[in-house]
């Protein structure tokens, strides 16, 4: 469910081995999703998901939006369908309760770009059945991913460790008047990271990064908030810490 980078990347990955239906909120979003995912049926009516065995929600990282979506899914899907969310920052237990079927609910936290990133963090409410856990572990295997079960805690493992590091890089930029390229090059060549922290923030999206930071209790740097106010959200907006051209 969704038409963003995570939803479309997951749909492309799954379409190699599964019949895939992509739900989009509007006709415009559906057209965009159709351009990004060739081997999938794109729909705008939730009822069209009724025949799906597993539905993975990848809408905006907003608690109210996600709770409402899971409530609606719980009403239209058959009782044996598994509902999963791509969140890592919101309470899995609360979203599961909103769906009305916590026994058939789990978190399937994939990473962008989905086609290249091997890890999936799996998290479940206490009420999740062993069958549900097994089905999502098996789905990860069929997608060519490594599923690791983690506690239902804000940020899970990766984001809880990652975002304080990313924000520390921004504070270094603010405090020491060092160029973004210098920080990123140091971390790529010195620590072996494939991407520097500031380029990674641009890739994630500064608005998304701020939302995740707030949800896990990390102190979001003022520089990030200023860039968001300026509309410099990162790569998707053409500018963030860096300038981008198509």
Where are the regions a protein language model picked out?
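NAD(P)-dependent Rossmann-like dehydrogenase/reductase catalytic/cofactor-binding core
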Residues: 3-5, 10-13, 25, 131, ...
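Flexible helical/loop "lid" subdomain adjacent to adenine-nucleotide binding pockets
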Residues: 161-177
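NAD(P)+-binding Rossmann beta1-loop-alpha1 motif at the extreme N-terminus of oxidoreductases
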Residues: 1-41, 76
């Amino acid at each position: 469910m969704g038409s963003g980078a995570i939803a479309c990347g997951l749909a492309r990955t799954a379409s190699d081995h599964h019949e895939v239906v992509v739900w989009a909120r509007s006709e415009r979003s559906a057209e965009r999703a159709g351009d990004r995912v060739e081997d999938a049926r794109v729909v705008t009516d939730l009822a069209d998901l009724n025949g799906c065995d597993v539905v993975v929600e990848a809408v905006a990282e907003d608690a109210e939006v996600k709770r409402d979506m899971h409530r609606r899914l719980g009403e239209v899907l058959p009782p044996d369908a598994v509902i999963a969310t791509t969140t890592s920052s919101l309470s899995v237990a609360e979203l599961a309760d909103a769906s009305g079927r916590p026994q058939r609910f789990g978190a399937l936290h994939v990473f962008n770009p989905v086609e290249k990133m091997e890890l999936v963090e799996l998290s479940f409410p206490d009420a999740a059945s062993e069958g549900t856990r097994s089905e999502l572990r098996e789905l990860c295997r069929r997608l060519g991913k490594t599923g690791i079960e983690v506690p239902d805690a804000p940020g899970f493992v990766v984001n809880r460790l990652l975002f304080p590091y990313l924000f520390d890089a921004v504070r270094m930029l603010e405090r020491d008047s060092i160029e973004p390229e210098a920080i990123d090059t140091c971390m790529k060549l010195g620590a072996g990271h494939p991407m520097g922290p500031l380029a990674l923030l641009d890739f994630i999206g500064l608005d998304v990064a701020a939302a995740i930071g707030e949800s896990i209790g990390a102190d979001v740097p003022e520089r990030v908030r200023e860039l968001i106010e300026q509309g410099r959200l990162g790569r998707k907006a053409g500018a963030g810490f860096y300038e981008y051209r198509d």
